[in-house]
Design a protein with these regions (language model features):
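Proline-centered turn/helix-capping motifs that create local helix->coil transitions or kinks
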Residues: 23-27, 219, 223, 232-237
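Flexible, glycine/charged-enriched surface loops at secondary-structure junctions
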Residues: 22-31, 85, 164, 280-288
């Protein structure tokens, strides 16, 4: 009886305090600002606006540009840990981390079991302890095994508890390489309606390096999609220095007057090939580069440029990013 009375008094006391508390007045702008952690200023990294003769650098394949961005990030951040299946001695399924374990050691380049949920959870745990982490999904298809960790833990931990989820998840994605239905999916749309995540998808080697560096420097969780079919088929100039491409900023590939194509990833190369084969059509091509947050200013400019828009992506038509952008254009 004494214990019950003690708890009853405690409950009644807490209830009285709760009823005396003034109701919370929600402020939408403040709530939205709390979705992402602020990115700290960095003096030793340049933001690359565009390639020109002064900064173009040497020709590299997309896969090599990703590896270079990852290696420079490891050199820049002694607290950066890489994790994934067979990424150490073997160098990963696509050999992006080949030689990394010899240069940076097994403490920073870690093989993991075949358990994506555990890898994402370990990456988040490292972040809570002050580390940065990059985990490699061997194939983007298997992100489903780690889905709960990503959308309910990584994406929400800063908004809910003020803790950073300083994690980048690299996602080898896309079809066209004869890999079958379990190794060829384009699943970026699964994540673009999850507040707290950032989603990037480069199409060129220069953007691949710069966006990866930007993702690692960002204190928020970033889903970094890289198309497998572009790894060794696409080359381009890549600056040698350590630089970022701004997350949330699209790239104008070329101007045009007849129609605008808004696309990203492999779609950029499809659009460029179509343009070469149809020189009689003046085509405006916009490479989104970032899918969350979208660059709505650039999208608006693309619409205004021609008054006609084609949305091009590899992902499933129903529920894809193209439909969302089409709806936004219609609304505005």
């Amino acid at each position: 009886t004494a214990i019950r009375n003690e708890f009853k008094e405690k409950i009644e006391s807490e209830l009285a305090m709760g009823f005396e508390t003034r109701p919370v007045q929600a402020n939408t702008e403040e709530e939205l600002e709390d979705v992402f952690a602020a990115k700290p200023a960095m003096q030793d990294v340049k933001v690359l606006d565009r390639l020109d003769d002064n900064n173009a650098g040497s020709e590299k394949r997309l896969i090599d540009a990703i590896g270079e961005g990852l290696k420079q990030s490891m050199q820049q951040h002694p607290n950066l840990i890489l994790m994934g299946q067979d990424i150490a001695e073997y160098g990963g399924a696509f050999k992006i981390t080949e030689g990394f374990v010899q240069e940076f050691g097994k403490e920073r380049v870690r093989n993991t079991p075949l358990c994506e949920s555990a890898i994402v959870g370990a990456a988040l745990g490292l972040s809570l302890k002050g580390f940065k982490s990059m985990m490699e999904m061997q194939f983007a298809d298997f992100v489903t095994v780690g889905f709960n960790q990503i959308v309910n833990n990584l994406a929400k931990i800063y908004y809910r508890w003020g803790q950073n989820a300083d994690v980048v998840i690299r996602m080898p994605t896309g079809g066209g390489v004869g890999a079958g239905p379990f190794h060829s999916q384009s699943n970026e749309a699964w994540f673009v309606h999850t507040p707290g995540l950032k989603v990037v998808y480069p199409s060129t080697p220069a953007d691949a390096k710069g966006l990866l560096i930007a993702a690692i420097n960002d204190p928020n969780p970033v889903m970094y999609f890289e198309h497998k079919a572009l790894y060794r088929s696409v080359s381009g100039p890549v600056p040698e220095h350590y630089y970022e491409i701004e997350i949330g900023k699209a790239r104008l590939v070329q101007s045009g007057d007849d129609i605008s194509i808004i696309t990203y990833g492999a779609g950029v190369h499809w659009a460029m090939d179509y343009t070469k084969n149809h020189p009689d059509i003046s085509i405006y091509i916009l490479d989104l580069r970032t899918l969350l947050p979208l660059d709505y200013t650039a999208i608006k400019d693309a619409v205004k440029a021609t008054g006609k828009v084609l949305l091009l992506h590899e992902d499933t038509l129903i529920g894809g990013i193209g439909g969302e952008i089409a709806a936004w254009i219609a609304e505005h």
